[in-house]
A protein has these predicted regions:
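Short, amphipathic alpha-helical segments that act as regulatory/interfacial helices
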Residues: 61, 104, 108, 112, ...
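Extended alpha-helical scaffolding segments used for macromolecular assembly and cargo binding
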Residues: 364-409
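Alpha-helical sensor/transducer elements of the RecA-like P-loop NTPase core
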Residues: 22-36, 45-49, 74-76, 105, ...
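A short, basic N-terminal segment
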Residues: 2-59
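Conserved phosphate-binding/catalytic loops and adjacent sensor/switch elements of nucleotide-binding enzymes
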Residues: 68-70, 74-151, 161-163, 215
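C-terminal boundary/linker of central alpha/beta nucleotide-binding cores
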Residues: 19, 63, 67-70, 74-81, ...
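Walker B catalytic acidic pair
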Residues: 157-158
Length: 409
């Protein structure tokens, strides 16, 4: 355990005229919280992404953002071990860090534990935290960081766990004080509520998202082979297409294929409704969403690619486009396509799970939705818009979920 002092609440138990602070408690930081996670056997290194993080050191803030199961934590753990340009300090963020005293105790302890931090550094001292004295705390932290002899990458993993306004404001301050020695690296399942547009405009933000984290067919083949599974190139291509390169989906598929008596039949029917995949999707992704958001996703799951106008018709909500945009920003479960951002896609395994869930609730609703989609496409004369995606969209008929019904673009 590493300890760091904390001071009183915003209403201190001493007279304001006393002009002093009193130590009232100590925060214990578990060593595992500030230790870089180990890499599992069969780990597929992503040298190109590590190089991108190295190249982004001058950007000051790096954001690795994708839904659960895309390998964010393992990528950053690998980068932390292999980067030669910066030392790294690791903090695994969890819900308890919505107590800002715990969060910043862990941050200071992680930084102080870096070998390049000299023993004379202020970072090895006792630190005080008071909600009413955040500017002073961060000014002192910035000064201590500025004095470091080498650049430092501070990794806050799973920053989506932070919802407390004070804790988030502290991270926001850290993006503003800009000590020259610090690169702040955030991993999250969705965009954290920080000033990301401002950072982009200033050229201070480097981003890695699901599209970059998704495995290529070659990386998928390497992962499957290292899992002890030898498949033909055609079988690998099928799994890669079904999973979209989603790492967790590939791992779950590999385990299921090993246990299957008929590999070809499994690969033919593998979808997001496979039990192991469905359990992961529900437990790690969908359970954290409100029912209204889950229902929205179920409805749009009838099509591979959903233009905003079709979403409006399916949901009977004029603001469906705004909801899609919000889902993209806050969950990363849908992705806008094309320069015009006029259509959205749901990750394939998640979409097939949602479609099966919709069908289990009765045949009437899927049939009604397909009828709405058919009428919308029949009336659509100006698709794709300029700059929009040019390939076709397919809506799955509820009676034959694996048979495509091609709609005009």
């Amino acid at each position: 355990m590493t300890t760091i002092g904390k001071y009183g609440p915003s209403e201190p138990p001493w007279p304001a005229s006393a002009g002093r602070l009193e130590l009232i408690a100590v925060v214990l930081v578990p060593r595992v919280k500030i230790t870089v996670p180990s890499l599992p056997s069969g780990f597929v290194a992503r040298a190109e992404l590590c190089a991108s993080l190295d190249a982004g050191a001058g950007a000051e803030v790096a954001l690795v953002c994708a839904p659960a199961g895309y390998g964010k934590t393992l990528l950053l753990a690998d980068w932390s071990r292999t980067s030669t340009g910066v030392d790294t300090a690791w903090v695994g963020v969890d819900r308890d860090d919505n107590d800002p005293r715990r969060l910043w105790a862990a941050v200071v302890a992680a930084i102080a534990g870096c070998p390049s931090v000299p023993q004379s550094s202020r970072l090895h001292g006792r630190w005080a935290w008071r909600p009413g004295a955040q500017p002073e705390f961060f000014a002192e932290l910035a000064e201590a960081l500025q004095a470091l002899p080498r650049p430092l990458g501070l990794i806050l993993d799973d920053v989506h766990e932070l919802v407390d306004p004070v804790a988030l404001h502290g991270v926001q301050i850290l993006t503003r004080i800009k000590p020259a020695t610090l690169q702040l690296v955030l991993s999250s399942r969705f965009d954290p509520p920080l000033s990301l547009p401002r950072l982009r405009l200033q050229g201070r933000l480097r981003e890695l998202r699901a599209a970059q984290l998704a495995f290529t067919p070659a990386q998928a083949a390497q992962l499957l082979e290292q899992s002890g599974l030898r498949l033909s190139p055609q079988q690998v291509e099928v799994l890669h297409r079904r999973t979209g390169g989603w790492v967790a989906g590939l791992r779950l598929a590999a385990r299921a294929v090993e246990q299957s008596a008929d590999r070809e039949a499994f690969l033919t029917h593998f979808s997001g409704d496979d039990r192991s995949v469905a359990d992961y999707l529900v437990g790690e992704i969908l359970s954290g969403l409100p029912e209204a958001a889950r229902e929205f996703l179920r409805v749009i799951s009838i099509c591979d690619l959903v233009p905003i106008g079709l979403a409006v018709a399916l949901l009977e909500r004029e603001e469906a486009g705004s909801v899609l945009d919000r889902l993209e920003r806050e969950t990363s479960l849908v992705v806008a396509t094309g320069r015009a951002r006029q259509a959205y896609q749901v990750q394939e395994l998640l979409r097939t799970h949602l479609l099966a869930d919709l069908q289990r609730r009765g045949p009437r609703r899927p049939a009604e939705l397909h009828a709405v989609a058919a009428r919308w496409w029949a009336a659509c004369t100006a698709w794709p818009p300029s700059g929009g995606p040019a390939n076709t969209s397919r809506c799955q008929p509820s009676s034959t979920p694996r048979t495509a019904m091609t709609m005009p673009w």
